[in-house]
């Protein structure tokens, strides 16, 4: 049994989704396009990185074979390893959305088979009666934005007016989400969190997946900067997840990063917060020391998506992958006999793609135990196979979706 460690590299898709055309994402390939840009020198940035994409640890764990299975081709410029370690494959998503809750819940054995509510792309994003209810319930003079937007762009556009007027900046995206940006000092972080809780309640009839608090600091567009105090307010998963089943079996679920928020704090034994991939890795390594037999440590590495994918920053995404890969030997040193490590993703966010939204892609599955014989696990038909593999490994009853690949 030992322990399980589930790491989600947020948005690290590997292309090839059979239903990508339905989402306008045919050809999207986060890994493949990053590698292509790196190989061409288009992801060189002075003081950050240069040259072909270099991920020797994940390549040795089967990442390049995963890419080949997903898309039919190896990533450009990345040398094939002489030997492979662990299990490797990829998975299709059966949830209808390409958003964070859908991906994570499906990973945890609970696909989202219903349709989320979404806001219109033309005209005002939010209905007048909703805006009126929010302003009345939260005692606001009004809102700014009321549109589809990139988070950094809309703060630059409305940040100064927000500071002058006290009106929060409200916006959405192609995901089922209501995002609220507000200044940590001028508006107040606690007030922003309280506002998000009010909006979460008002949005339930609209079937919106998440309300996200996006605090920022600075005084002008030149120095506005989002802080690490983001909070996600999600609806509850539609049925018990792997996390609920583990807690019911008296195991501990250690949620690192935004995992607690994604699951609406249900099925969580302990929450460990950290900001930035490297600090998230530090927190994860510490939690690995503290986890007991039968426990799950579940970490979301959000920067790949939030800082690089949505901002279409290819060089930044490549450098973040290389920095993550370089720390995997530290993870390996923490593993005990019988421990299971799984690396995966929740969706794609191809930084070379049009727009700023997520992309529908297959996700990688890398699974490793000390001494395990390397083999491919093929293309899995649902992310839920990941959760069922963890359930099997930790010795709890199987759930209704997915099947273990162990």
Swiss-Prot record:
Q: Which family does it belong to?
A: Belongs to the phosphopentomutase family.
Q: What is its EC number?
A: 5.4.2.7
Q: Name one GO biological process term.
A: 2-deoxyribose 1-phosphate catabolic process
Q: Domain of life, per the record?
A: Bacteria
Q: What is this protein called?
A: Phosphopentomutase
State the reactions this protein catalyses. Answer: 2-deoxy-alpha-D-ribose 1-phosphate = 2-deoxy-D-ribose 5-phosphate; alpha-D-ribose 1-phosphate = D-ribose 5-phosphate
How the cofactor binds, per note? Binds 2 manganese ions.
Tell me which cofactor or cofactors this protein depends on.
Answer: Mn(2+)
Name the major location.
cytoplasm
InterPro entries (alphabetical): Alkaline_phosphatase_core_sf, DeoB, Metalloenzyme, Phosphopentomutase_DeoB_cap_sf
List the GO terms this entry assigns under cellular component, sorted alphabetically.
Answer: cytosol
What's a single GO MF annotation on this record? magnesium ion binding
Residues bound to Mn(2+) 2: 305, 310, 358
NCBIfam families in alphabetical order: deoB, PRK05362.1
């Amino acid at each position: 049994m030992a322990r399980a460690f589930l790491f989600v590299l947020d948005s690290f898709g590997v292309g090839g989704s059979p239903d990508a055309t339905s989402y306008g994402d045919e050809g999207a390939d986060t890994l493949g396009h990053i590698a292509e840009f790196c190989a061409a020198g288009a992801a060189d940035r002075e003081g950050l990185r240069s040259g072909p994409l270099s991920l020797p640890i994940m390549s040795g764990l089967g990442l390049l074979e995963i890419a080949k299975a997903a898309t039919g081709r190896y990533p450009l410029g990345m040398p094939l390893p002489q030997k492979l370690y662990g299990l490797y494959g990829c998975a299709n998503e059966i949830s209808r959305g390409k958003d964070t809750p859908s991906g994570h819940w499906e990973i945890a054995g609970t696909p989202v088979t219903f349709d989320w509510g979404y806001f219109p792309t033309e005209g005002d994003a939010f209905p007048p009666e909703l805006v009126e209810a929010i302003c009345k319930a939260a005692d606001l003079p009004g809102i700014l934005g009321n549109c589809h937007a990139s988070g950094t762009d809309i703060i630059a556009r409305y940040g100064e007016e927000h500071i002058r007027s006290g009106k929060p900046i409200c916006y959405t995206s192609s995901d089922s989400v209501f995002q609220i940006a507000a200044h940590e000092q001028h508006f107040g972080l606690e007030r922003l969190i309280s506002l998000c809780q009010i909006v979460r309640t008002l949005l339930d009839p609209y079937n919106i997946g998440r309300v996200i608090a996006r605090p920022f600091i600075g005084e002008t567009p030149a120095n506005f900067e989002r802080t690490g105090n983001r909070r996600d307010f999600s609806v509850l998963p539609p049925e018990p997840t792997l996390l609920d089943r583990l807690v019911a079996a008296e195991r501990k679920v250690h949620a690192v990063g935004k995992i607690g928020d994604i699951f609406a704090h249900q099925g969580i034994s302990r929450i460990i917060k950290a900001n930035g991939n490297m600090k998230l890795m530090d927190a994860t390594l510490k939690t690995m020391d503290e986890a007991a037999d039968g426990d799950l440590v579940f970490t979301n590495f959000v920067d790949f998506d939030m800082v690089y994918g949505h901002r279409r920053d290819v060089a930044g995404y490549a450098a973040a992958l290389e920095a993550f890969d370089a720390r995997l030997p530290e993870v390996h040193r923490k593993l005990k006999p019988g421990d299971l490590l799984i690396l995966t993703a929740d969706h794609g966010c191809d930084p070379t793609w049009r727009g700023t939204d997520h992309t529908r892609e297959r996700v990688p599955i890398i699974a490793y135990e000390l001494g395990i014989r390397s083999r491919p696990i093929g293309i899995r038909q649902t992310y839920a196979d990941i959760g069922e593999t963890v359930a099997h490994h930790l010795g709890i009853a199987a759930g209704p979706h997915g099947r273990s690949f162990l």
